[in-house]
Amino acid sequence: MAKSYGAIFLLTLIVLFMLQTMVMASSGSNVKWSQKRYGPGSLKRTQCPSECDRRCKKTQYHKACITFCNKCCRKCLCVPPGYYGNKQVCSCYNNWKTQEGGPKCP
């Protein structure tokens, strides 16, 4: 009898952890960035250096990141939020590719 209560308790605990994980995963994927603040044309050329400093602050390849970020920002007039990813917010930044098809903008 004690073993069955223990098994039911353990099963209930596992189900609760799975539900909690599902809720956290679904709420984290709904992050939406403001197109006005980060979308194409949201910056002036004079704002590019400070936005690229923010974007490249935590990268290992700081000098290369700054160079390419500034180049992309001057063309697209936007820099995605955060330190990595989120390129879908700035379509020009996301779609500009190298000759090999890799991303041009960090």
From Swiss-Prot:
A Pfam family assignment: GASA
Coiled coil: none
KW Cell wall biogenesis/degradation (keyword) present: no
Example of a GO biological process term: gibberellic acid mediated signaling pathway
Residues in the signal sequence: 1-25
Compartment(s): Secreted
Phenotype of gene-disrupted mutants: Increased number of axillary inflorescence shoots and decreased seed weight.
Keyword terms: Disulfide bond, Gibberellin signaling pathway, Secreted, Signal
Triggers of expression: By gibberellins.
Effect of residue 76 to A: Loss of redox activity and ability to promote gibberellin responses
Tissue specificity field: Expressed in flower buds, style, stamen filaments, vasculature of petals, root phloem, vasculature of cotyledons and rosette leaves and developing embryo.
Recorded consequence of changing residue 78 to A: Loss of redox activity and ability to promote gibberellin responses
Biological role stated in the UniProt entry: Gibberellin-regulated protein involved in the regulation of floral meristem and floral organ identity, and promotion of seed size and weight. May play a role in the promotion of gibberellin responses such as regulation of flowering under short-day conditions, seed germination and inhibition of gibberellin oxidase. Possesses redox activity in E.coli and may function in redox regulation in planta.
Family according to the record: Belongs to the GASA family.
Protein's recorded name: Gibberellin-regulated protein 4
Organism, scientific name: Arabidopsis thaliana
Classification of source organism: Eukaryota, Viridiplantae, Streptophyta, Embryophyta, Tracheophyta
Originating gene: GASA4
